[in-house]
Curated annotation (Swiss-Prot):
Function description: Component of the ribosome, a large ribonucleoprotein complex responsible for the synthesis of proteins in the cell. The small ribosomal subunit (SSU) binds messenger RNAs (mRNAs) and translates the encoded message by selecting cognate aminoacyl-transfer RNA (tRNA) molecules. The large subunit (LSU) contains the ribosomal catalytic site termed the peptidyl transferase center (PTC), which catalyzes the formation of peptide bonds, thereby polymerizing the amino acids delivered by tRNAs into a polypeptide chain.
SMART domains: Ribosomal_L14
Protein name: Large ribosomal subunit protein uL14
Locations listed in the record: Cytoplasm
Transmembrane parts of this sequence: none
InterPro entries: Ribosomal_uL14 (IPR000218), Ribosomal_uL14_CS (IPR019972), Ribosomal_uL14_sf (IPR036853)
Matches recorded under Pfam families: Ribosomal_L14
Gene: RPL23A
Length: 137
């Protein structure tokens, strides 16, 4: 069981990707971008769109990419967000794009490599993503 699924707690972050957002796909699975359909594990408030931050699992579809990946709902994890968020040490951090990777429901990646940096909040929470990432910021 070790190494699969989310491990530990995640601090509150600025929510960057509401339902309907499109983000880049940063793995080598063959998908180019991901369309957010739902956010896993969020509470609800009347008339508020669920939104995700780095480290959150979302349900997404592929809008551009390999035909065998398109038109299916699959879980993905957000690894970068362009909206600034505050870390506990007072540093504000943001990336130049929104990006995610396709995973299975247990959190294991479909691809085998991640392009670009990964947020530390995401790498701490998802061990399989941390092991496949090049740079953790």
């Amino acid at each position: 069981m070790s190494g699969s699924g989310a491990s530990g707690n995640k601090f509150r972050m600025s929510l960057a990707l509401p339902v309907g957002a499109v983000m880049n796909c940063a793995d080598n699975s063959g998908a180019r971008n991901l369309y957010v359909l739902a956010v896993k594990g969020t509470g609800a408030r009347l008339n508020r769109l669920p939104a995700a931050a780095a480290g959150d699992m979302v349900m997404a579809t592929v809008k551009k990419g390999k035909p065998e990946l398109r038109k299916k709902v699959m879980p993905a994890i957000v690894i970068r967000q362009s909206k600034p968020w505050r870390r506990r040490d007072g540093v504000y951090l943001y990336f130049e794009d929104n990006a995610g990777v396709i995973v299975n429901p247990k959190g294991e990646m479909k691809g085998s490599a991640i392009t670009g940096p990964v947020a530390k909040e995401c790498a701490d929470l998802w061990p399989r993503i941390a092991s496949n990432s090049g740079v953790v910021v």
